[in-house]
């Protein structure tokens, strides 16, 4: 009601956006976000919510392109950094599914420049390495993940599997280094 009485109310728009997001009313979320950007085009809160709208449509690259200049303008704004990190994570997973791990890692590395302590980004980087069959790097980054109590054992088994793959790779490399090239010639 506050927004209908005063469409430019910053507090009313923030409340309307947050409550519509929590209630799953995405059309209203998008409408109020657009309204907020219209009235407050430089406000990071509305810009971060605009990125959320793009993410919801699985337009992660568009979200990142939208956020990059804003992030350069507000390099320490937590809302913008959080939105950029989230879009980066989604985009990296999208690129990984498309079999483009190098691009996925580049996206994650850029996000980690701004959000270096983000464990979710580090874990996702480990997932990308695992998809690219790089067990040592996968293990290093996935160990940052903090599993819930329910998934703890499963996650520990997964890390053990990565360690096992690392060991097999080391054994194979040691074997190859120990052999002389002439032995392969018949």
List where the protein language model places each region:
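Register position in tetratricopeptide repeats
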Residues: 22, 56, 90, 97, ...
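Start-of-helix register in tetratricopeptide repeats
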Residues: 11, 45, 79-82, 86, ...
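Single-residue signature of alpha-solenoid repeat helices
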Residues: 29, 63, 104, 137-138
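Short coil turns that delineate tetratricopeptide repeat
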Residues: 7, 41, 75, 116, ...
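TPR/TPR-like (Sel1-like) alpha-helical repeat modules
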Residues: 55, 64, 68-73, 130-153, ...
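Canonical positions in the second alpha-helix
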Residues: 1-2, 35-36, 69-70, 111, ...
